[in-house]
Regions:
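Internal gly/pro-rich beta-alpha loop/helix module
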Residues: 1-13
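Glycine-rich phosphate/dinucleotide-binding loop and adjoining beta-alpha-beta core of small-molecule
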Residues: 2, 57, 62-173
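Short, functionally important structural connectors and interaction interfaces within domains
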Residues: 10, 26-32, 40, 107, ...
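A generic local secondary-structure boundary/capping motif
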Residues: 12-15, 97
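Glycine-rich phosphate/diphosphate-binding loop of Rossmann-like nucleotide-binding domains
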Residues: 17-85, 167
Length: 173
């Protein structure tokens, strides 16, 4: 593909400041299913995380990208792990950090995914009908449980990523 060729040329001519380093990144949104056809997500495109993964790879790093659902092409030369939910992202990141603790260490974990803050307390197995007496409202108290934070949790268990850079959205767009 022409874009892959251009990427390889860019990588070839980029100084290898990260040669020999291992980078773990998260990117994109997460999707918390309400039922088989509805869910809670956000408008994250994943562009920042994918661009960081590409830049680190160009600079010589070995990069693993854990990504929620996006419409972006997978960055060339990057190990890709696709996930949907916040729990899946947390599990994938934890597995990578556990693997790193037992074999080859990760030099940097960059968490830029827009991980869901909430999830339904229980996913319905069938589409919830419109005239339902009690739709599963997403509100702070009722059928909502906190979603796991894939950027906050991994560094809390003495893993190599004890200092985890993450970029939260603190203002409305």
């Amino acid at each position: 593909e022409p874009l892959d060729l251009i990427e390889e040329l860019n990588a070839f001519f980029t100084p290898k400041r990260l040669q020999g380093k291992r980078i773990l990144l998260t990117a994109g949104p997460t999707y918390e299913a309400i039922d088989p056809v509805r869910g809670i997500t956000n408008q994250s495109s994943g562009k920042m995380g994918y661009a960081l993964a590409q830049a680190c790879r160009r600079a010589g790093a070995s990069v693993t990208l854990v990504s929620g659902p996006t419409q972006l092409p997978r960055p060339a030369g990057v190990r890709f792990i696709g996930v949907q939910s916040a729990r899946q992202m947390l599990d994938a990141v934890t597995a990578e950090l556990d693997l790193a603790a037992s074999t080859i260490s990760i030099d940097c974990f960059i968490a830029v995914a827009a991980v869901a803050d909430w999830r339904p307390a229980q996913e319905a197995t069938q589409k919830i009908k419109k005239p339902s007496a009690q739709p599963p409202l997403i509100e702070p108290h009722a059928p909502v449980a906190d979603g796991p934070d894939a950027s906050a949790q991994p560094g809390t268990e003495g893993t190599p990523a004890a200092g985890v850079p993450s970029i939260p959205l603190v203002e409305n767009p």
